[in-house]
């Protein structure tokens, strides 16, 4: 928890126990016509803090112009993750940032704007029940991310389940459940279930 979150919980006399139930990751998507499909963590930091504003600064072959960063919502968990975990608690200061209302609109924006880079949850890469999902989008590319700078094909990973599990993909988020049940009753039983094999298969789906 952040200090402000802890203070808020204490003020409400709500002191939950937290435990992890799943892992998620941020996926970076670009227009299919964009030749740049590799980014390092440093590249992402430089884009967010305004040091890198043009695609040609990342790849001289890239003539797509100014980089436009697109989020699903200005107050979303994606924005918070970038600011807290990628920028070390500092705000995003890139002036070319666009925020839409939902993930499907991020995908549509990237489809229509070759200069854009969209940031979404990787669950949108795998949910085949949703026809707005990236599985069905042939004019979108999912970028590979590298912890090492500069990024190379050998050092970069896409947000696939295996690379999230072994920690090779850089932008991983832990999903926590919070319990405030001193009697350790039904909520704790559910917690143990969701952490078990059957519960984890449900989470995976």
What are these regions (language model features)?
Residues 2-3, 7-24, 29-205:
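Exported/periplasmic ABC-transporter solute-binding proteins
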């Amino acid at each position: 928890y952040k200090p402000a979150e802890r203070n808020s919980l204490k003020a409400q006399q709500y002191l939950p126990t937290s435990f992890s139930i799943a892992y998620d990751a941020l996926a970076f998507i670009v227009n299919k016509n964009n030749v740049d499909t590799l980014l390092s963590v440093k590249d992402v930091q430089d884009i967010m803090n305004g040091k890198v504003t043009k695609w040609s600064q990342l790849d001289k072959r890239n003539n797509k112009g100014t980089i436009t960063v697109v989020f699903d919502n200005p107050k979303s968990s994606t924005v918070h993750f970038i600011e807290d975990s990628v920028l070390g608690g500092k705000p995003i200061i890139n002036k070319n940032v666009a925020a839409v209302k939902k993930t499907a609109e991020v995908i549509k924006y990237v489809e229509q704007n070759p200069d854009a880079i969209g940031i979404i949850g990787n669950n949108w890469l795998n949910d085949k029940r949703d026809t707005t999902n990236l599985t069905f989008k042939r004019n979108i590319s999912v970028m590979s991310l590298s912890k090492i700078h500069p990024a190379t094909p050998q050092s970069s990973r896409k947000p696939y389940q295996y690379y999230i599990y072994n920690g090779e993909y850089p932008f991983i988020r832990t999903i926590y459940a919070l319990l405030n049940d001193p009697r350790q009753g039904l909520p704790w039983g559910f917690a143990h279930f969701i952490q078990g094999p059957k519960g984890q298969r449900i989470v995976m789906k």
